Amino acid sequence: MKKIAVLTSGGDSPGMNAAVRAVVRTAIYNEIEVYGVYHGYQGLLNDDIHKLELGSVGDTIQRGGTFLYSARCPEFKEQEVRKVAIENLRKRGIEGLVVIGGDGSYRGAQRISEECKEIQTIGIPGTIDNDINGTDFTIGFDTALNTIIGLVDKIRDTASSHARTFIIEAMGRDCGDLALWAGLSVGAETIVVPEVKTDIKEIADKIEQGIKRGKKHSIVLVAEGCMTAQDCQKELSQFINVDNRVSVLGHVQRGGSPTGADRVLASRLGGYAVDLLMQGETAKGVGIKNNKIVATSFDEIFDGKDHKFDYSLYELANKLSI
């Protein structure tokens, strides 16, 4: 293998730059030319592909976001559109493509490997949602978790000062991991996630019990994939009358300098992705399972159920929030 390319796609996550850096430097170490595809799959279509050198990834490991930029590209689902993208890679002699992103990004990579056997593809899980099969953790999850913890800690200060209940909405799409892990970490009184049926009356009863024993404030942490914080507020008001406020944390969860854990994970996965390409592997996603770096076929990732919600952690959070 003499030439590879790397792109970031979908929602950005802290640590993507560290992953790109690892891909670029591992490839150059092995005398492989590296090209950066700017603006994700849209960049593949627009031929926005440029050679990267060692210096191209200098001073990036600590930066959030992605210097390669990212963009949604729904038209990439069309085969005729993909032919243009594939030709833009082939004319440069690029034999391998590393795609950093989520489930949709992986599906684009799989299509390329199916439709052009000359180009190998490897996926790296980059999303704060932690919703990708084939890995215990995705790049960006730990940073987003710590961001949420810091924000909720601050909100709790004002909740305490005014004796209020705060209903806080966290990201995560259809996965409740961010809300669960953050909720346990901040001592939230209630955690609302898509994986567990929500009983609003039970939440109201729990808040009321806390008030009766002298509790002045409460934190309700809601995963966006379950309901909005506003909807939760409306439903709660049917069962309990307490001074409350809504806080939607929003895109601040995607930003910020990556934590040490995300930098290390991104570096390990980026380096391993290049190793797999050199070994002739294709149509696989890399990940970490039981602290071991692994590779799983895209088919298994799409069909698999190995990334399961940790119900034991949810039960622990409930026990500790009495």
UniProtKB/Swiss-Prot annotation:
Catalytic residues (positions): 129 (proton acceptor)
Binding site residues for Mg(2+): 103
EC number: 2.7.1.11
GO biological process: canonical glycolysis; fructose 1,6-bisphosphate metabolic process; fructose 6-phosphate metabolic process
InterPro entries in alphabetical order: ATP_PFK, ATP_PFK_prok-type, PFKA_ATP_prok, Phosphofructokinase_CS, Phosphofructokinase_dom, PKF_sf
Catalysed conversion reaction: beta-D-fructose 6-phosphate + ATP = beta-D-fructose 1,6-bisphosphate + ADP + H(+)
Record's subunit section: Homotetramer.
Protein name listed in UniProt: ATP-dependent 6-phosphofructokinase
